[in-house]
Amino acid sequence: MCIFCNIVEGRDHGYIVYSNDRVVAFLDKFPITPGHTLVVPRTHYENFLEISEDVIPYLCTAVRKISIAVKKALKADGIRILTNIGKSAGQVVFHSHFHIVPTWSQDPDIMKDFVPRKEQSREYYEYVQKAIIETLKNI
């Protein structure tokens, strides 16, 4: 079974920041930057090109809303929104998802060399999760 399906269905733990009947968003286990969030459709689609057209508006609305919240909650200067389609493009988990990656002006080009990613502490995930959830209440 897909790791993202397991998180969506509650079989695996994820630091969920947003959820509705079509979409779930949770913190990336191996963040590129603090606040790196993944937005996934509840239904399993291998990649964005396979998503049912009736799901796309819900997904895009969630990506926008969560991006606003992440940017505000983490006081980021910018946001990168990306999705990889296929192994050659860097897709690792074959459940369609969007990466919301906050950026700051003083940071180097974090995407240029894909800085090494590592799992963070439980305290990190809980702090960021709470900040994003609280910010979403005002969006």
UniProtKB/Swiss-Prot annotation:
GO terms for biological process: purine ribonucleotide metabolic process; sulfur compound metabolic process. Pfam families: HIT. This is Uncharacterized HIT-like protein SSO2163. It comes from Saccharolobus solfataricus (strain ATCC 35092 / DSM 1617 / JCM 11322 / P2). Residues 3-110 form the HIT domain. CDD domains: HINT_subgroup. One of its GO terms (molecular function) is adenylylsulfatase activity. A motif (Histidine triad motif) lies at residues 95-99.
